[in-house]
Amino acid sequence: MYNFIIILILFFTIIYCYKCEGIQFNDPGMKYFYKKNNIIYDKKRQLLIKNNKIADISNGLNGKKKYTDKNSMKKIFLDNGIPTSKWYIWNTNLPNSRNLEMLKLQNLNFPLVIKPYDTYGGVGVITDIYDFSRLMRIIPTISKTTDAIIIEEQVIGDTYRIFVFNNIILDIYKIRKPKIVGDGKSSVMKLLKKYINDPDVKLTKAQIDYDLIKKQGYNINSIIPKNKKVIITNVCNSTVGSEPLTVNKNNIHPANIELFKKVARTVNLNACGIDYITKDLEIPYYIYGSIIETNSKPGIKSYIKNNPNVIHKLLNNIKFK
């Protein structure tokens, strides 16, 4: 009887967690908009209430898919004609030699990017792996935190976050690469230490690309001139300190707009953050471009900061019934 009760509790806990997938409407910046529009936010049930009418702003039971399962999502992309990079799943329960043998059979092109299998938000992502020797140096560290690792061909270009709600593209942002800014007296190492210790940043030492820093003319002991910016990694995500830049949707090829809407429909999400890499958004995806992943719980904090109008678009597309 006791075991049955435990199982029952776990079941309803999981269902509740699924229900809570969706936009993070509890961001502090939303409170002003709720008050201005006479809206009540029910955090527990993920509902907005206005004039005795409600709007479900969760992704409901659509969230039962594990969107952090990168392998499953990439298979969904391929099955639906959505461009995504080639990949291999490195099973940490197998000998490294066996994994390496199978990886080579996949004929992935360098550079490669390595990610923990079931995380999101740029956590644990390491880019710019140009040879197998560096890959094998990184694997042991990543293996300590996950049972499987996804290794992908790295798509060269700029990273964009597309915010889709109810099949409407609310905004598109270019995610700029993390960088340190010189003060004319501090070394690269000191600036990196300060950057990593920022409580709002989740970048690890392993994610810092010293070769990239070297290509910009600096080493760990270099003093960076005042206000000079130095990119420290090609990992792009707000969690690692990347800054979003609003993109003019008029400069985006129509085929790409349709692709983003298709992705949201395919993964069956009302609220969706899509990560896309291309050299230029004016280039249609079928010539160059790749969907990296989707996020079933996109935060809106950075959107509020960079473009408050996106909240008005969001509220205008919420259906109260």
What do these predicted ranges mean?
Residues 48-207, 253-257:
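Active-site nucleotide/adenylate-binding loops and adjacent lid/helix of ATP-dependent enzymes
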Residues 2-68, 72-75, 93-97:
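ATP-binding N-terminal substructure of ATP-dependent carboxylate-amine bond-forming enzymes
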Residues 238-251, 265-271, 278-321:
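C-terminal active-site "lid" helix and adjoining low-complexity regulatory extension at the edge
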Residues 192-282:
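A long amphipathic alpha-helix within ATP-dependent nucleotide-binding catalytic cores
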Residues 28, 37, 80, 106-108, ...:
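Residues at alpha-helix termini
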Residues 32, 47, 162, 275-277:
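Short acidic loop-to-beta-strand element that houses the catalytic metal-binding Asp/Glu
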Residues 30, 101, 260:
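Aromatic/hydrophobic pocket-lining residues that form π-stacking "cages" and hydrophobic walls in ligand
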Residues 33, 76, 80, 259-267:
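Generic non-transmembrane alpha-helical segments
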